[in-house]
Amino acid sequence: MKKIQKINLAVFLAFIVFTIPLSYVLGSDFMGRQEKPWHMQGSVHEDSLSQEYLGKYKILDKVPVTLQVERSKEKRVLILIDAWGVPFDEKKMAKEFAIFKDVPHEYAIHKRLKNVTKHAELVEFRTDSTESIVAIEKLSRLDSLLMNSDYKTVALTINDSKEGSEESLRNVLNDIAELMKKFPDVQFIVQGAHRPILGTPETRREYYAHWVPVVIGNF
């Protein structure tokens, strides 16, 4: 191999050695600045509740709510509401909680590990073998069931709000509040199953990823 060829080869190899790491660094930086698809994006501080929430509400950890709330009545109703989450805007949360202001209540925020309704049902509706429990599908059945049965615990998942409609959610909350007033001797534990996930990406990003509201009524 001629001397000039050796020099050219050495220059070429040096160029390759230099450009490969540089292209990796620049490429990584470029990719890091690209906007990810909505399902890969995390909300800002999505798992860190604001000081406003921490100072105003009782915070329940990832242990099932039903194990953290003492039974205060002979009968108890456990309600999961699909797509009821904790918004970054605390004032919005306060308006939803205020629907229950006319019944004895306690508000709380609960850590929910997964955004899946079935997971919430498995976690919250587990019961001791000595305790009778019945699961129903419609809120309209609850009235007659509480009046005409001896069940100690009734469990219900409400899907009316699963599409993320705020109007549907408020209607559901109002109906539950009216039942609390009608049955003051029944303890109600109402909580979100997970944040809204079927709406627009913008709507999803308005909520904490793994926190849900809890209302304990007639406690």
PLM features: what roles do these ranges have?
Residues 5, 26, 36, 44, ...:
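Intrinsic disorder/low-complexity signature
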Residues 15-18, 27, 33, 41, ...:
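Generic signature of intrinsically disordered, low-complexity segments enriched in small/polar residues
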Residues 24-94:
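Membrane-interface segments at or immediately adjacent to transmembrane helices
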Residues 1-39:
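Transmembrane and membrane-interface helices of multi-pass
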Residues 64-219:
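Solvent-exposed soluble domains appended to multi-pass membrane proteins
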